[in-house]
């Protein structure tokens, strides 16, 4: 049966150390098999390393890195007639954050450093300087949207 009213997104509790909902969401994205305490120790260790390296406050450095990875446009497949077009669409703010976090975690997991905390710190450091695999992923998505700008009128 269809829902009659729009469901409210679940309220997420802010993380215990910095009091940031964004960081709590990031910890949840990193978490594997429900092991939140391990995910928290990885993230806090990475932020500690990041703040020592950049000289900025940990949360501020994290937000800069995330801002550099967030996509503004993406492509969605749309079938028109017999062919499928990659139609560029703007990304909603919540999805923007979710994609940015997911890309940072994926890029950190693919790195070859010793510990996950170090990998995450290096990826966040690269992202804050507009380089690294996560930023490259965003550039690829933007390039794809730019290349398919001609199909923007198929937007729905």
Curated annotation (Swiss-Prot):
SUPFAM superfamilies: Ribosomal protein S7 (SSF47973). GO terms for cellular component: small ribosomal subunit. Disulfide bonds: none annotated. Keywords: Ribonucleoprotein, Ribosomal protein, RNA-binding, rRNA-binding, tRNA-binding. GO terms for biological process: translation. GO terms for molecular function: rRNA binding; structural constituent of ribosome; tRNA binding. One of the primary rRNA binding proteins, it binds directly to 16S rRNA where it nucleates assembly of the head domain of the 30S subunit. Is located at the subunit interface close to the decoding center, probably blocks exit of the E-site tRNA. Part of the 30S ribosomal subunit. Contacts proteins S9 and S11. Belongs to the universal ribosomal protein uS7 family. This is Small ribosomal subunit protein uS7. The gene is rpsG.
């Amino acid at each position: 049966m269809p829902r009659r009213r729009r469901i409210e997104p679940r309220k997420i509790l802010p993380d215990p150390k910095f009091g940031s909902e964004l960081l709590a969401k990031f910890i949840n994205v990193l978490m594997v098999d429900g092991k939140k305490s391990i995910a928290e120790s990885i993230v806090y260790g990475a932020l500690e390393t990041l703040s020592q390296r950049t000289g900025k406050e940990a949360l501020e450095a994290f937000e800069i890195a995330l801002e550099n990875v967030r996509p503004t446009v993406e492509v969605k497949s749309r079938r028109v007639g017999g062919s499928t077009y990659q139609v560029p669409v703007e990304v909603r703010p919540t999805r923007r954050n979710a994609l940015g976090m997911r890309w940072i975690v994926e890029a950190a997991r693919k790195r070859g450093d010793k510990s996950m905390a170090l990998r995450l710190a290096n990826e966040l450091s690269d992202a804050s300087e507009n380089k690294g695999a996560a930023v490259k992923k965003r550039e690829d998505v933007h390039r794809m949207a730019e290349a398919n700008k001609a199909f923007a009128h198929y937007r729905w």
